[in-house]
């Protein structure tokens, strides 16, 4: 069996700016995001904390792009699952340039993290319901083209009955 390889990127980070939304001639939406991922560690020699931030270009297509444009803002925390692609383009002087991006297409995922509360730039009540009290919900997940699975609900506890507990103290050996 020949292996075809795997091209899958998973990122959790914060948006560096509001998404840039454009529409293709076919009418499909395209969202461009800049996503920051950070890692921190303690320097073994000096003992001081160090931090490194990587910036990722993310391109989202279709309905997910429209959702990103509507709900994501600078600073939003988001989970992205897509594929790495490098495209070639020419700058104004005709020089070949390359850009590597995480592409979220059919089968990709964008999940908003970090909850809804406390955001200064969130719409007020009546504009999408973001300010209205709701059941606790930490994230919203959207999959590009893939059928989304309903969130699993915790199993309900059995209703208490009025019967006394069963006494299994019998002498049956099996």
From Swiss-Prot:
Motif Important for interaction with partner proteins location, chain numbering: 169-174
Residue numbers spanned by region Disordered: 110-174
Any single biological process term in GO: DNA replication
Domain SSB: 6-111
Keywords associated with the record: DNA damage, DNA recombination, DNA repair, DNA replication, DNA-binding
Protein name from the UniProt record: Single-stranded DNA-binding protein
DNA-binding span(s): 55-61
Keyword DNA repair recorded: yes
Reported function: Plays an important role in DNA replication, recombination and repair. Binds to ssDNA and to an array of partner proteins to recruit them to their sites of action during DNA metabolism.
Pfam families the record matches: SSB (PF00436)
Cellular component GO terms held in the UniProt record: nucleoid
Keyword DNA repair among record annotations: yes
HAMAP family tied to this protein: SSB
Disulphide bond pairs: none
Subunit structure of this chain's protein: Homotetramer.
PANTHER family per record: SINGLE-STRANDED DNA-BINDING PROTEIN
A GO MF label: single-stranded DNA binding
Compositional bias per record (Low complexity), positions renumbered to this chain: 132-160
Organism: Proteus mirabilis
């Amino acid at each position: 069996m020949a292996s075809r390889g795997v091209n899958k990127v998973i990122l959790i980070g914060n948006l560096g700016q509001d998404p840039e939304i454009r529409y293709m001639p076919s009418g499909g939406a395209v969202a461009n995001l800049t996503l920051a991922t950070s890692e921190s560690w303690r320097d073994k020699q000096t003992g001081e904390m160090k931090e490194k931030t990587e910036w990722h270009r993310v391109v989202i297509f279709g309905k997910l792009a429209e959702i990103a444009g509507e709900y994501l803002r600078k600073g939003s925390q988001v989970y992205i699952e897509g594929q790495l692609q490098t495209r070639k383009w020419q700058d104004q002087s005709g020089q070949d340039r390359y850009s590597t991006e995480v592409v979220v297409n059919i089968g990709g995922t964008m999940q908003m993290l970090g909850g809804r509360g406390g955001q200064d730039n969130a719409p007020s009540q009546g504009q999408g319901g973001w300010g209205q009290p709701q059941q606790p919900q930490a994230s919203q997940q959207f999959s590009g083209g893939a059928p989304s699975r309903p969130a699993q609900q915790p199993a309900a506890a059995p209703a208490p009955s009025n019967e006394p507990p069963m006494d299994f103290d019998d002498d049956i050996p099996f």
